[in-house]
Amino acid sequence: MRRGIFVAPFGELADPRVLAEVAARAEAHGWDGFFVWDHMLYDEVEAIADPWVALAAVATATRSLRIGPLVTPVARRRPQKLAREAATLDLLSGGRLVVGLGLGGDRGGELSRFGEEADPRARGALLDTGAELLDAWWRGEEAAGVRLLPRPAQRPRIPLW
């Protein structure tokens, strides 16, 4: 059995240096994974770190932890940007990235207030299409008329959860 920590990068943990220190301590105490939420807004929380930038700090502060966002809403992140960010982070981490994909929710207007798709069925279609694109691009294949390189460190691709 593996053990992972699921952290909301909010408040004090919105500082990627603090988050990286927490991850390093978790690794030193035998934890196997370190995962962060991906939100733009959340209830009364004001300070929220970008998970991809924060995970870059975590990657450089650790050596063996599996890392990743749980979950990233593809409808908000855009597949092409997500593919590039994830491949870069996977290379930086030495192949330790896991990407959790999901619909995301519009709780508190987290999507609609920024002009993003709020309808769950439409987000579901975007998730399906996005997962197919990510799979192809991370395998080094052409999709939507383009190849996105470099490929991630993991083969055949980054694990999708």
Listing of model-derived features with the role each one plays in the protein:
Residues 142-149:
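Active-site glycine-rich loop that binds ribose-phosphate moieties when present
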Residues 2-14, 75-142:
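Flexible, glycine-rich active-site loops centered on histidine and acidic residues
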Residues 53-57, 85-87, 147:
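Short, charged beta->alpha transition segments
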Residues 37-41, 70-72, 114:
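Short linear capping/connector segments at secondary-structure termini
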Residues 1-61, 155-158:
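N-terminal beta1-alpha1-beta2 module of alpha/beta enzyme domains
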Residues 64-67, 150-154:
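Short, surface-exposed connector motifs at secondary-structure boundaries
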